[in-house]
Amino acid sequence: MVSGAGSSGTDLQVVNTPPGAGDLDAGADCGAVLDVTYRDFSEAHPDFEMPFSGDVVRRGLVASTLGVDHKPVFSDTVGHPALKDSPTAIDPDWSPTVPVITSAATFNQWYNTTAGVNLELSKKLQLSESAPGTGLFGYDSSAFFPLAPSEGFGITPKGNDLGMNFLFTTEIHVHFTYGRGQKFTFRGDDDMWIFVNGVLALDLGSMHGPAEGTIDFDAQAASLGISVGGSYAMDVFHAERHTRGSNFKITTNIACFVPSVVK
């Protein structure tokens, strides 16, 4: 477990909301409901429920910019340890050796619907305001199983003692308008990569316990190439790859997201 792999974001607070987003009405184009593409996998895929050790965030598994298809680009099977209190920097003091991704070919299947490998399901995820008028929105689940045991490949891994559908990926594409003071905090497991304006803004790769990181848009504006008042893409990629926990928490003071369609 690596809490604080990024900055803590403790100035943002949000109440818990029930796990599993369900199929909600998105309403207006601009709001706090996120369109989500889930892809369900079985344990037959070599990157899911794979043997691993270390249980820490690995960075550098994906490239620092999105591909032309608006998907993460594979970079490395092993990666590098995370530098504490940074959303993307690596710790140069030690180097892991155990692979946590099999190959570029297997990784390419994570966020691309592939016959015989994964099953795609579209749902919605509702961000709820912590209290009326606070401007703080979030989603918080310590049992994040958006796919029912009857959906996709069903209960995976087969016979897991929780009887839940693990082993899936999460993909979200939105636009937002950048205003001063905005932050976006994620805490959960396993892999999480968030790109802003096509640039990697939060890197929490690999299989690990709940790890947290914060995108501070003001502090990262120059590296992300963003300016106050501009509209920018945010592309979110998550993977739940290993039993036996599944955590997913978003906390943000961005109130308005516009869904983006990526073909």
Enumerate the language-model features and the residues they cover.
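Acidic/polar, compositionally biased interaction segments
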Residues: 12-263
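N-terminal Sec signal peptide cleavage junction
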Residues: 1-8
